[in-house]
Amino acid sequence: RDEAQNMIFELQDKLVEKEYLSAKLYYDLGSYTGNSSYSSTGNNYLAAVVTAENALKEYPYSKKREDLSLLVLRAKYDMAKESVDEKKSDRMRETIDEYYAFKNEFPESKHLKEVENIFKDASKYVKDDEE
């Protein structure tokens, strides 16, 4: 019984790793559309967010939780930066919301400096937009 349980956890870890690598691939592709005949800036960032968030829901106790959450924050931020002006402000606000969620869940993260920089930049944009 214990052996079966351990095997299940081991296989779940492999599935989480696969999901993380898929989300990271989408993130790394960024706004690249390849040979596509239509322009869909940010689509890969959105795919990264969806993939990572699904993995977080499906495997809430994963060791990759922090990495997946950071990937969501980065992807939302980069998507916001590349957004058209009409959507940029809302997407920067989503980035700020994601920052607070990350900071609450991982207050001791080794990525805090990067996360703080994302927050400062997003806040600056939102503040400039409100003036």
What function would you assign to each model-found segment?
Residues 1-131:
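Acidic, polar-rich low-complexity tracts and alpha-helical solenoid repeat scaffolds
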